[in-house]
């Protein structure tokens, strides 16, 4: 074929391509025209996201780093990230190796509280802290049949290093995985990431004083956040079902605002918990909370930090005082600091708490038998624990009698 012929053929193809592009643009314009209340949505800051023959709505809100949400300004996140990077602590909330925009604060709104394929996520909300701002982004499912667009809009721009949620390990992310599985052939893969679920820490620290360790309760009791004219989360499913029928934006504006506050509260709560863990000036002052923090350190095998917390509580009067003393004595024993452990066991041997009293008496018996070789004293101490036999398990009772029999043999030989 001549050069002229080739050029003519290319010209035809170019014309066809231009025509297809115009048709596609026309389709998209028509799709925009089909979106109910589009002008009202846009006035609220929402924009359509079109994917294939589906759409969702996206809203973006920005806050300055100086903005205070409860006790903290968002700029304080950088401070706690710096503290984590300077710390040698091993902890589930550690952000060592991260910077502030690696944390992805995430929450969802769903059509129900149960799990499984019958429960639909209709709102994905997330926040990120950048060098000069905090950005909250929300992806709304306008009606059933548009989930591919919803998750495409979310996954196409989300680069998650570590997720920060409140009950997200048990609820939010499993729900995302379930919905993603149903349409995975049309979507990018879900990312791999670390996960900080703040609910677990909240339960550890505050379950002794909160009937429900919900995010709303933690906001009021710990973060100093008072929501005004908030749409409660439990109303979200009902409002969404009304919205599906009516499509009126006013039905969901309150839900969107509630979700926005939720993800912002995750930032403040992460700052709050991190400061309690890392900063002496923010360490728990209330005795039961300080004990809970010590047990959290124990769970992470951070013995020195746990001892530091427990030593502050030795002479404090509170409900779990003897349990705290017992934990401290066992940590001393672990570090071979028996001269500090024994006085605690002797004090606990007179405790009103049967469990602590029995544990302390057994530790004293072990000490006199194995360390001091004072078998008579070990026997005397072990027999003291027979008074608690009624509250012991069958296995514990059997072990106690074996110990006493062994000590009698050693003492008489």
Swiss-Prot record:
This is Uncharacterized protein YprB. PANTHER family: EXONUCLEASE-LIKE PROTEIN, YPRB RIBONUCLEASE H-LIKE DOMAIN-CONTAINING PROTEIN. Pfam families: RNase_H_2. It comes from Bacillus subtilis (strain 168).
């Amino acid at each position: 074929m001549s050069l002229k012929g080739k050029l003519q053929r290319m010209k035809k193809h170019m014309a066809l391509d231009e025509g297809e592009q115009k048709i596609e643009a026309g389709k998209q314009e028509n799709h925009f025209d089909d979106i109910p209340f589009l002008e009202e949505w846009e006035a609220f800051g929402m924009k359509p996201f079109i994917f294939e023959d589906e759409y969702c709505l996206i809203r973006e809100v920005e806050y300055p780093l100086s903005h205070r949400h409860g006790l903290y300004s968002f700029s304080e996140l950088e401070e706690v990230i710096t503290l984590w990077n300077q710390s040698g602590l091993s902890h589930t909330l550690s952000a060592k190796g991260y910077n502030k925009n690696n944390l992805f604060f995430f929450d969802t709104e769903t059509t129900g509280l149960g799990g499984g394929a019958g429960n639909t996520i209709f709102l994905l909300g997330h926040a990120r802290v950048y060098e000069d701002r905090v950005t909250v982004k929300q992806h709304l499912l306008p009606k059933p049949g548009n989930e591919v667009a919803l998750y495409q809009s979310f996954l196409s721009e989300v680069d998650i290093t570590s997720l920060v949620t409140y009950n997200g390990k048990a609820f939010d992310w499993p729900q995302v995985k379930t919905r993603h599985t149903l349409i995975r052939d049309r979507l990018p893969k879900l990312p791999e990431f670390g996960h900080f679920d703040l609910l677990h820490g909240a339960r550890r620290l505050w379950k002794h004083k909160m009937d429900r360790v919900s995010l709303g309760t933690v906001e009021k009791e710990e973060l100093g956040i008072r929501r005004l004219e908030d749409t409660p989360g439990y109303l979200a499913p009902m409002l969404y079902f009304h919205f599906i029928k009516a499509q009126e934006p006013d039905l969901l504006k309150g839900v969107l605002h509630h979700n926005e506050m939720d993800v912002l509260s995750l930032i403040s709560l992460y700052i709050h918990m991190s400061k309690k863990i890392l900063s002496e000036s923010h360490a728990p002052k209330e005795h039961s909370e300080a004990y809970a923090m010590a047990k959290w350190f124990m769970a992470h095998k951070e013995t020195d930090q746990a001892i530091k917390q427990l030593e502050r509580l030795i002479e404090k009067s509170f409900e779990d005082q003897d349990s705290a003393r017992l934990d401290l004595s066992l940590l001393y024993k672990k570090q071979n600091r028996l001269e500090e452990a024994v006085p605690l066991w002797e004090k606990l041997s007179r405790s009103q708490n049967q469990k602590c009293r029995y544990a302390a008496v057994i530790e004293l018996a072990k000490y006199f038998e194995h360390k001091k070789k004072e078998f008579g004293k070990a026997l005397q101490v072990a027999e003291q624990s027979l008074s608690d036999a009624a509250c012991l398990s069958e296995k514990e009772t059997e072990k106690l009698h074996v110990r006493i029999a062994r000590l009698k043999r050693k003492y008489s030989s």
